[in-house]
């Protein structure tokens, strides 16, 4: 599958809100409500059933993100889609700003030290609250803060490489 055709997991349906078919959404976008900018959505149920959805709308209320979907008009319809994951095609996301990256684009890149030692490849990333962290799988798992320019010196998508200032023994 080409990179621009990849499906990117952005959130999931977590429950109903009220009686008229409003839906509580968990969003992993930043900011949270940005999930509504990226459409169409591919909804994937826990059993693997998939359906396309265009026209999802929503708003934030307190700590909740509330959505409405075309054709979902009551609580029973919402219950039927609880647990559904929300994906979008990679091509639905705008290009990142210079020196900003989508985590999904970093996954699979080889990580090298300044001295050329290969540490492994990026498995995934997570946020620890202070910064993002690269999880590297190689001969052993390593966690490196994704902090530019302190630790991450360069990201080269053409060479499929990230260069880091990191002690390979650490």
Curated annotation (Swiss-Prot):
Start and end residues of each PRC barrel domain: 98-170
GO CC, alphabetical: cytoplasm; ribosome
Entry keyword Cytoplasm: yes
InterPro entries in alphabetical order: PRC_barrel-like_sf, PRC_RimM, RimM, RimM_N, RimM_N_sf, Transl_B-barrel_sf
Keywords: Chaperone, Cytoplasm, Ribosome biogenesis, rRNA processing
GO biological process, one term: ribosomal small subunit biogenesis
Compartments it resides in: Cytoplasm
Pfam family, one: RimM
Gene3D superfamilies, alphabetized: PRC-barrel domain, RimM
GO MF annotations in UniProt: ribosome binding
Family (UniProt): Belongs to the RimM family.
Subunit structure: Binds ribosomal protein uS19.
Domain comment quoted from the record: The PRC barrel domain binds ribosomal protein uS19.
PANTHER family reported in the protein's UniProt record: RIBOSOME MATURATION FACTOR RIMM
Its job: An accessory protein needed during the final step in the assembly of 30S ribosomal subunit, possibly for assembly of the head region. Essential for efficient processing of 16S rRNA. May be needed both before and after RbfA during the maturation of 16S rRNA. It has affinity for free ribosomal 30S subunits but not for 70S ribosomes.
Protein known as: Ribosome maturation factor RimM
Organism listed in the record: Xylella fastidiosa (strain 9a5c)
Gene: rimM
